[in-house]
Amino acid sequence: SAEAPALAGVHLFCAAILYARLIGPDEVSESLRKKIVAELGNQKAAQPDYAGFMGILALYYLGDFVSINRIIPRYRHDTQPADQPCPVIAARLVLQSFSNKASHEASKNVMAFYRENDGFAALHHAPAADLLSTAVALFALHFIDADIRIIKPACLSFVDKLYQHGGFVATHDDTQPDIEYT
């Protein structure tokens, strides 16, 4: 019997997503699925909504909709703390969509991080956009079928400008490509 590698947290979730997309269902994907369900059951993450988003997204790609339906009630929040970063607010939007609670107001909360003719910033008061926030925000907005036609050209241009020397940098001020962004 195949066993999933000894991974946890975001590493487990990302490995499961990649494995599901590249390999598909088999004994390893089943082992990954079981580990994710167990990990989401004892979630003690600093950002539980973001960890839940990543875990549920992994289950989505693994095709485990039964576990998603069982787990999603833990993430049904009607309030959104104002001090949360863009990736967490965007993650919450995706989680809400699984329980049919995504709203126009929730997508406006994500759009509040958009910087005109650029991308999305991590925090409301951050002066510049960054690649991670832009990617997560665009993913969340696309996931709920929000109309992103107006911001799409600027965001694509922003991402394109972050590709330097064979890899991606996090922001315009970054000079060194990072494997995390590539």
Q: Which stretches of residues belong to each language-model region?
A:
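HEAT/HEAT-like alpha-solenoid repeats
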Residues: 38-45, 73-81, 111-115, 119, ...
